[in-house]
Swiss-Prot record:
GO MF annotation list: lipid binding
Pfam families noted in UniProt: Tryp_alpha_amyl (PF00234)
Function statement: Lipid-transfer protein that may be regulated by the transcription factor UDT1 in developing anthers and play a role in tapetum development.
Name the UniProt record assigns to this protein: Non-specific lipid-transfer protein C4
Superkingdom of the source species: Eukaryota
Gene that this sequence comes from: C4
Residues glycosylated per entry: N91
Length: 94
């Protein structure tokens, strides 16, 4: 059961990354350059679940290759998801 939940979480994370890439492209303003950068983050999907070990070298390389503009755009899109889905903002502070 735990492995199933882990696989589901990894799949959900991968889906979010792909959606962010598509969203960045749809927003225009050079978003097309972000798509390949964000797609490379799929190498990080195993790390993006609670309890994961250290990220792989491939993940770290992918993360280091993302431009600041693409990273900020992806974070902005991710932060807007709850309100766009008519949900409360997620507060992760303790």
């Amino acid at each position: 059961m735990a492995a199933s939940k882990g696989n589901a979480a990894a799949a959900a994370c991968a889906l979010v990354l792909v959606l962010l890439a598509v969203g960045a492209e749809a927003q225009g303003g050079g978003g097309g350059e972000c798509v390949p950068q964000l797609n490379r983050l799929l190498a990080c999907r195993a790390y993006a679940v609670p309890g994961a070990g250290d990220p792989s070298a491939e993940c770290c390389s992918a993360l280091s290759s993302i431009s600041q503009g693409c990273a900020c755009s992806a974070i902005s899109i991710m932060n807007s998801l709850p309100s766009r889905c008519h949900l409360s903002q997620i507060n992760c502070s303790a």
